[in-house]
């Protein structure tokens, strides 16, 4: 499971010209799900995200978690994160989990974050979306359960 995290001042998702989801200060997560991923990956990643100290304290040191700052999380499915660009010039998505199975783990990830007391918004699984964000920093991390 691959998560690209961006610390944001705000983020929103638009589908079909309509804003369907938005957050203020928090973390925007693009989530890619690999064929080898399982519930174990979901729990590991959710725990890591919730406890990762990527927000600055009063001394401008990254020392605060999303819980500490009372922030929100937006999760957007992003199967291209499971893409492989090593061979040729066209990405291969053979490692990406089929959408029917991936959606369950996507939902499990969102549910796990919510169970930890974090407000979570989401994109629309398997939809073409316009994602807007205002980075804070910028601060970007890639978390991989492999």
UniProtKB/Swiss-Prot annotation:
Cross-referenced Pfam families: Tyr_Deacylase (PF02580)
Compartments, record wording: Cytoplasm
InterPro entries: Daa-tRNA_deacyls_DTD (IPR003732), DTD-like_sf (IPR023509)
Family: Belongs to the DTD family.
Name under which the protein is recorded: D-aminoacyl-tRNA deacylase
Entry function: An aminoacyl-tRNA editing enzyme that deacylates mischarged D-aminoacyl-tRNAs. Also deacylates mischarged glycyl-tRNA(Ala), protecting cells against glycine mischarging by AlaRS. Acts via tRNA-based rather than protein-based catalysis; rejects L-amino acids rather than detecting D-amino acids in the active site. By recycling D-aminoacyl-tRNA to D-amino acids and free tRNA molecules, this enzyme counteracts the toxicity associated with the formation of D-aminoacyl-tRNA entities in vivo and helps enforce protein L-homochirality.
Assembly with partners or alone: Homodimer.
Superkingdom of the organism of origin: Bacteria
Domain notes: A Gly-cisPro motif from one monomer fits into the active site of the other monomer to allow specific chiral rejection of L-amino acids.
Cited CDD domains: Dtyr_deacylase (cd00563)
Motif Gly-cisPro motif, important for rejection of L-amino acids boundaries: 137-138
EC number from the UniProt entry: 3.1.1.96
Catalytic EC class: hydrolase
Keyword tRNA-binding: yes
Source organism: Thermodesulfovibrio yellowstonii (strain ATCC 51303 / DSM 11347 / YP87)
């Amino acid at each position: 499971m691959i998560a690209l995290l961006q610390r944001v001042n705000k983020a929103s998702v638009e589908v079909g010209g309509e804003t369907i989801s938005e957050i203020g200060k928090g973390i925007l997560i693009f989530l890619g799900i690999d064929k080898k991923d399982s519930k174990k990956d979901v729990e590991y990643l959710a725990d890591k995200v919730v406890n990762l100290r990527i927000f600055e304290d009063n001394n401008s040191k990254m020392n605060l978690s999303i819980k500490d700052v009372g922030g929100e999380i937006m999760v957007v499915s992003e199967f291209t994160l499971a893409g492989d660009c090593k061979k040729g010039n066209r990405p291969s998505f053979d490692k990406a989990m089929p959408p029917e199975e991936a959606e369950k783990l996507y939902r499990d990830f969102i549910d796990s974050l919510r169970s930890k007391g974090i407000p979570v918004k989401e994109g629309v699984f398997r939809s073409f979306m316009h994602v807007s964000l205002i980075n804070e920093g910028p601060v970007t991390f890639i978390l991989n359960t492999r």
